[in-house]
């Protein structure tokens, strides 16, 4: 990942989210609902705590979060949704990971197959992660008055592997197992209460460059994937 800033890809993700905020909140609510079925206390349920942090970073209203948890409390069917990871590689080396939460896996698989077939791509083995992706935690927050030197000392001691800077923010990357410790250290040491991004995701370690025309078509394809109600997140290694 050295030499390539994740900021451009992060910015694209945010722009897409802003354009479809209602859809994003719907997907986040589902994620919170599924996580909450395993326990309603985020301090005792790491999956719920992560889902709430992710939702807050995307400006999901507190009422929406509480409503999703309340819905889980009243739902006795804890196996209503299945989490699945799909992957595919298109011509030119553009790879995709699509995570889904579905109450009908056959429908979801059929939809994913149809979408990727239109791109002349076949789905890889379900659950398999292409080698061009790394599973990472990512935390982004406003710089405020915090110096990079002070941040670096705390971050590196608590699992940060990379520290990137933009004009107004810091972006920290860690292994998933260090994510919670790093987030807590930032909150405790610097009294950070709001994060612009706070989640565990798949980051590309190799990027694929395509023509401007093909890039535009692929971005439209990414939007189609995100429009599917069963799709939670779409990750790719397209160099934007």
From Swiss-Prot:
Any one of the GO CC terms: cytosol
Q: Where does it live in the cell? A: Cytoplasm
SUPFAM superfamilies reported for this sequence: YebC-like
Q: Which InterPro entries match?
A: Integrase-like_N, TACO1_YebC-like_2nd/3rd_dom, TACO1_YebC_N, Transcrip_reg_TACO1-like, Transcrip_reg_TACO1-like_dom3, YebC-like
Q: Which GO terms describe its biological process?
A: regulation of DNA-templated transcription
User: Which keywords appear in this protein's UniProt record, sorted alphabetically?
Assistant: Cytoplasm, DNA-binding, Transcription, Transcription regulation
The keyword Metal-binding is annotated on this UniProt entry: no
Residues passing through the membrane, by range: none
* An example Gene Ontology molecular-function term: DNA binding
In this record, what's one Pfam family? TACO1_YebC_N
The family note in this entry says: Belongs to the TACO1 family.
Protein name in UniProt: Probable transcriptional regulatory protein MS53_0373
């Amino acid at each position: 990942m050295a030499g390539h800033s994740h900021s451009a890809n992060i910015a694209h993700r945010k722009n897409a989210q802003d354009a479809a905020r209602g859809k994003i909140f719907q997907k986040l609510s589902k994620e919170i609902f599924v996580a909450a079925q395993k326990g309603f206390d985020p301090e005792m349920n790491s999956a719920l705590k992560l889902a709430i942090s992710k939702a807050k970073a995307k400006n999901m209203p507190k009422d929406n979060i509480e409503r999703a948890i309340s819905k889980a409390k009243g739902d006795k069917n804890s196996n209503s949704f299945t989490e699945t990871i799909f992957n595919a590689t298109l011509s030119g080396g553009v790879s995709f990971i699509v995570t889904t939460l579905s109450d009908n896996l056959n429908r979801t698989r059929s939809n994913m197959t149809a979408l990727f077939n239109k791109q002349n791509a076949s789905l890889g083995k379900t659950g398999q992660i292409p080698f061009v992706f790394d599973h990472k935690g990512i935390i982004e927050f406003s710089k405020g008055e915090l110096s990079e030197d002070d941040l670096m000392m705390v971050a590196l001691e608590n699992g940060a592997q990379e520290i990137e800077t933009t004009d107004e923010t810091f972006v920290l990357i860690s292994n998933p197992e260090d994510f919670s410790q790093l987030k807590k250290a930032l909150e405790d040491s610097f009294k950070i209460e709001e994060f612009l991004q706070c989640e565990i995701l798949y980051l590309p370690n190799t990027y694929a460059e395509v023509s401007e025309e093909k890039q535009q078509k692929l971005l439209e394809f990414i939007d189609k994937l995100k429009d599917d109600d069963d799709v939670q997140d779409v990750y790719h290694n397209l160099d934007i």
